[in-house]
Amino acid sequence: MSPQTETKATVGFKAGVKDYRLTYYTPDYETKDTDILAAFRVSPQPGVPAEEAGAAVAAESSTGTWTTVWTDGLTSLDRYKGRCYHIEPVAGEETQFIAYVAYPLDLFEEGSVNYMFTSIVGNVFGFKALRALRLEDLRIPAAYVKTFQGPPQGIQVERDKLNKYGRPLLGCTIKPKLGLSAKNYGRAVYECLRGGLDFTKDDENVNSQPFMRWRDRFLFCAEAIYKAQAETGEIKGHYLNATAGTCEEMMKRAVFARELGVPIVMHDYLTVGFTANTTLAHYCRDNGLLLHIHRAMHAVIDRQKNHGMHFRVLAKALRMSGGDHIHAGTVVGKLEGERDITLGFVDLLRDDFIEKDRSRGIFFTQDWVSLPGVLPVASGGIHVWHMPALTEIFGDDSVLQFGGGTLGHPWGNAPGAVANRVALEACVQARNEGRDLAREGNEIIREATKWSPELAAACEVWKEIKFEFPAMDN
């Protein structure tokens, strides 16, 4: 090597391995308004100090690597490194703690949820010094929020499009979710919408299979929507699942839905990914479509208490990436959801400003700076007896989705839809009159059965159905 091209180490460089905490544990650091803040539940290997484990998380999810490198001298680590700035114990867990990490905003590409996750959780979860790691929450700074479009329409625009106010929206997933022909599927959609539902839904398992290709389903569902609208005088919709094996195919399905004039399409945002979801959300905004989001695969990521990622993080990411509805559990049905925690991330989806509240699992105050809100969808094992609790828990800005609780009605799909609509209207009226839904809910439903035989039949069928299992998370 000639003298002109030879590169020598600077005087300050010293090769070798040193503790992460010497560089990345900074308890005196004052967080900035522009920092992305993360709360990790850390379970270190035996013998690894909390400060070292927290610093390792900060390092490996930002600028650090396992050994000192001479190119550190070519940049400013103080400007770009993540910092573990606080550690606190987890009540009742001697081997776990919460590590708070601050990331400079310059580490992240504008408007890119996928790269935010690539940086923060992409590599560090396999780190050998940790037995387990869970991302509990993120604080997204206003400066970064403003680089995202968010939901294609938002709650208020959706209500204006549908001309429906003052109550939750009602939906239904068509069952059986697999095996119906397109024509029979469309018939079920029509019956449910005619009976009083606002929406029906493709199950996430439905895309384009030999028994029902997507184009045929879209056509028969559109026919059902227009027929039900003509008969009821209400705007109706069906969540047409645009999820596909390629982004090109996904967009083709969304374009066809727009050409049919239907109001809403659907997407499985976790299985397909944030890049595809953001692309579809942008198309929906530009073309006046609502976007319903299913969270298929979420429990693979969020169900374990000490490893993975809490759903509140996935919910925040969805609001940034774009979606007008997202499934959020029920609290009372067959799918998991503890009340305070569920309402914590429901508020993160809907509200513009949310205060820190650890009792609801909210680690950071979050300001969405007018990013449109997302309607939470309560779905899974719910029926008419749950209506008072669902109305009281989720309030007006929600979608209450009854699949088996509609199509399982002994008289058929349309009477099942009637039963749900009557139950909802009764609960909303009782609430508006000042009655206590939590205490008087069953009485309110029984009173409504006197003038709705459809509701009376539904109440008789599901009077003994309960799903009583403890929640996994707290």
Swiss-Prot record:
Its cofactor is Mg(2+). The keyword Metal-binding applies. Its main location: plastid. The gene is rbcL. Residues 1-2 form a propeptide. Mg(2+) binds at residues 201, 203-204. The basic functional RuBisCO is composed of a large chain homodimer in a 'head-to-tail' conformation. In form I RuBisCO this homodimer is arranged in a barrel-like tetramer with the small subunits forming a tetrameric 'cap' on each end of the 'barrel'. This is Ribulose bisphosphate carboxylase large chain. It catalyses: 2 (2R)-3-phosphoglycerate + 2 H(+) = D-ribulose 1,5-bisphosphate + CO2 + H2O; D-ribulose 1,5-bisphosphate + O2 = 2-phosphoglycolate + (2R)-3-phosphoglycerate + 2 H(+). It comes from Medicago sativa. Substrate binds at residues 123, 173, 177, 295, 327, 379.
